[in-house]
Amino acid sequence: MRHFIYQDEKSHKFRAVEQQGNELHISWGKVGTKGQSQIKSFSDAAAAAKAELKLIAEKVKKGYVEQAKDNSLQPSQTVTGSLKVADLSTIIQEQPSFVAETRAPDKNTDAVLPWLAKDIAVVFPPEVVHTTLSHRRFPGVPVQQADKLPQLRRLACSVSQRDNKTATFDFSACSLEWQNTVAQAISQIDGLKTTQLPSPVMAVLTALEMKCTRYKVREDVMDQIVQEGGLEYATDVIIHLQQIDIEWDYANNVIIILPSGIAPSYLEQYSRFE
């Protein structure tokens, strides 16, 4: 049985999954409780194994962390990651497809949640009111729409080469999932960026732009991501931005990408995305 835990300020829950032949045994609930369980049957063992991988990929994407059987990392959990841009083909792996989870509607209430009711006022705490502006520069004035989205298209394009030195990227401290994401992002550096890229990949490119370029003002980047990809996509990018940090050895053009449990300092300039 493989166990996964999700924890944030509001919840602490588990998900466990195990394949037994052509069956998938699943359990979930709050940590410390028995939770609920379900058995799904498939046509054969291969189909069950594929479904297990999809379920695990979905939960990891949502922030679940697998719990090892002991406190030491398994051999398969470590990968050396000091690479030149040209060496990335050895690390990029096929991503498992994402399967959306469907939930039955809550039968205990037919009421609309108050913050979803039409035309209802949203009341903010006094300590954050000064940041809840419709636009960070001019309250009430919408962000100007760009025609060709130049900041987005050329995102992080100057990172791989600087002063005739090819950048070296070290992301070995990241999890396997993030190592794969970072490798995909680096492979896209010299191409034109669009919001068809997965949001974690876009987050890495945005982090590289903000941390490893000479120009620190990048407000237009997020405006253009929102314009093309929508607010939900941009929000997902911001969430993933807070999961990584970057250290840059400018003299040697070595870029180290690290996991981060809190919002890194380079996000401070974007504290008012709204």
Curated annotation (Swiss-Prot):
Residues 2-78 form the WGR domain. It comes from the Bacteria. Induction: Repressed by LexA, induced by DNA damage. Pfam families: WGR. Has been implicated in selenate reduction; a mini-Tn10 insertion mutant in 'molR', (which was mapped to 47.3 centisomes i.e. this locus), is defective in the reduction of selenate. This is Protein YehF. It comes from Escherichia coli (strain K12). The gene is yehF.
